[in-house]
Design a protein with these regions (language model features):
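Glycine- and small hydrophobic-enriched segments that form the cores of compact globular domains
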Residues: 84-86, 94, 106-115, 194, ...
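C-terminal functional module detector
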Residues: 1-38, 46, 52-114, 120-156, ...
Length: 389
């Protein structure tokens, strides 16, 4: 607008005030006793952002969120400013970004670019549990084209031979799982095929062996969660060929009106026959066949999603009956409001053995694990490490 222009503000035909545009541009805001006019967009710059690991001096994968001081989000180009969620992204719009509360984050390889407003900008950067989260208020100056941020690792579990993984992830692509895993400093993702009525998910991802990122920083294994809505669910890790049918017994987990064609015990045996690992997910629900599976030695570990007292009590019932069951952490991620590895399993692999998927599962079965939703645990009992029996 020309500097001589007049901005008129009305409410239901009632004149609240008039402001000269030139004065508003000069002062930023003009007010009277009835209305205040303020310029909230002072212009914008296309900014190239790099996030640096403080220890290595190199760009580091992470998740990042930009917003103005008034709360307006500015996503890096190619990402969503606001990710629809609250189960609105079940099975769709999954991968590349994540929403936590009201903030949508972009997963980046350490670099990104896009429009940022001139003036004060708030930036949030995070990377899993082992890096200090960063929140900074900074200024984007006219003409600025570059921004460098630094994050610092506060502990290094891999240096102590603990490797993290999520046992329970749905709907991501294999490459999307690598991207999100590295952004969350997660070493292993178990990407689970399954069935939801007439919908089959991730069929095309199954290859029967692990996918290792080109930089060796993450492993994704597309495997299965087999489900029956009353008998229970099973996570079958490390499958070399499918265990069919994936789901059985109708409802919304198999074909509508379908019959019960198999049991969890059969699925567990078929997994074990090919060297796989059997996890009882989100203990204790559904809860008809798990007791049989545990009593007959068909379960290698049980998975926590939360620390709800119901699951806690159920787990201790089995311990008190003499069944030694390793605990693992998995998210059951199905939407864009759950970051991969929000609940994760740390598995100890000895110095003389390579970190790979087979060894990760081997030592998971052995119980050399702890699970976490954020805290990092270091303890011994009579000199024995976590997982000793």
């Amino acid at each position: 607008a020309a500097s001589s222009a007049t901005v008129t503000v009305k409410s239901h035909g009632d004149l609240l005030g008039q402001v000269n545009w030139g004065e508003l541009e000069q002062k930023g805001q003009v007010a009277n006793d009835r209305v205040k006019a303020e310029i909230i967009d002072s212009g914008r710059n296309w900014v190239h952002t790099t996030v640096i690991d403080e220890d290595t001096g190199m760009p580091i994968p992470c998740r990042i969120h930009f917003r103005s001081v008034k709360g307006v989000p500015y996503a890096p180009h190619g990402y969503h400013s606001h990710v629809n969620s609250d189960m609105g992204t079940w099975h769709i719009d999954n991968g590349g970004d994540v929403r936590l509360g009201q903030s949508s984050y972009a997963y980046i390889d350490g670099t990104c670019q896009g429009w940022l407003p001139r003036g004060e900008v708030i930036v949030d950067v995070a990377r899993g549990f082992e890096y200090e989260p960063l929140r900074v208020k900074m200024r984007v100056e006219p003409g600025q084209r570059n921004l460098e941020l630094r994050i610092k690792r506060w502990c290094d579990m891999k240096a102590d031979r603990y490797f993290s993984g999520d046992t329970h992830v749905h709907f991501l692509s294999t490459q999307g799982a690598h991207t999100e895993a590295q952004g969350e400093d997660l070493d292993v993702v178990n990407l689970l095929l399954s069935q939801w009525g007439h919908l089959f998910s991730n069929t095309e991802e199954f290859i029967g062996h692990p996918s290792v990122a080109h930089n060796g920083k993450s492993i994704v294994y597309a495997t299965q969660e087999n489900r029956q809505h009353v008998l229970g669910h099973l996570t079958l890790l490390g499958l070399k060929y499918p265990v069919d049918p994936w789901c059985s017994g109708g409802s919304n987990e198999a074909e509508h009106g379908g019959n019960l064609e198999t049991t969890l015990s059969h699925w567990a045996d078929a997994c074990r026959d090919q060297g796989g690992t059997v996890i009882l997910p989100h203990i204790p629900n559904p809860n008809c066949e798990p007791a049989t599976l545990i009593a007959t030695g068909r379960v290698d570990a049980v998975e926590y999603l939360t620390h709800a007292i119901y699951g806690h009590n159920e787990y201790y019932r089995y311990l008190n009956c003499g069944y030694k069951l390793p605990l693992v952490g998995g998210t059951d991620k199905m939407t864009s409001d759950v970051p991969v590895g929000l609940y994760r399993t740390y598995v100890y692999i000895p110095d003389n053995e390579e970190f790979n998927y087979d060894n990760w599962c081997k030592y998971l079965r052995a119980g050399n694990t702890f699970l976490s939703g954020g805290p990092i645990i270091r303890l011994t009992a009579d000199g024995q490490p976590i997982g000793s029996t």
